[in-house]
Amino acid sequence: MTERTEAIPESTPEVASNSARSTLCYPYPAPPAPGSTLEIAPGVRWLRMPLPWALDHINVWLVDDAEGCAVVDTGARTEAATAVWRATFPQGGEAHTAFRVTRVLVTHMHPDHVGMAGWLTRAFDCRLWMTRTEYFNCRVAAADTGREAPADALDFYRRAGWSESAIDVYRARFGRFGQHIHALPESFRRLQDG
């Protein structure tokens, strides 16, 4: 005698997404409110920075050090991000703001991570810490701001099989990187392995 079993329905992305989401366990019931921080470990504070895109926020970190606190990642160059930084470090604000910002560390050159780095380093008279590759790639991308997409790049993408509509999107977005970042400082402290 064989036992009869029901067929397992095929998994769809929606089913997979919902089941994965229902099994996630978050250590905090809610993110910090704009301009507020949440201490997630001794000396490590979580700050949520708004973004004007589909991904509507980035997590940035304030890490206490011997002389104040280091900022890890910065948010994109927007009025909302500037307002959050001003609310986070007001004159005579919360107890942790008595520390000065000692450095700004940027993990990589995407505008949501590096966008406010130049503003923060000037506002707090501190150094930017970044890898050499990311720093110089950021400077190169910013230098293209306002330029049209190069013909050789358009030819490359056509040869790679891009449709004309995809080329049009690339052309429309090219040269906008610098709009999302404050100018980087002329020097930086190099982060490297080891």
What are these regions (language model features)?
Residues 34-96, 126:
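Conserved beta-strand hairpin/beta-sheet module of binuclear metal-dependent hydrolase folds
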Residues 1-7, 43, 107, 126, ...:
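Intrinsic structural disorder
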Residues 43, 75, 115-116, 194:
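Glycine-centered flexibility sites
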Residues 20-21, 71, 101-103:
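A short, structure-level motif marking secondary-structure boundaries and short turns
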Residues 23-24, 46-52, 104-107:
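Short, flexible loop segments at the rims of nucleotide/cofactor-binding pockets, characterized by
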Residues 80-83, 87-193:
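Active-site HxH/HxHxD metal-binding segment of metal-dependent hydrolases
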Residues 1-36, 142-168, 176-177:
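Accessory terminal helices/loops
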Residues 33-34, 57-59, 187, 192-194:
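Residue-level marker for the onset of beta-strands and adjacent loop->beta junctions
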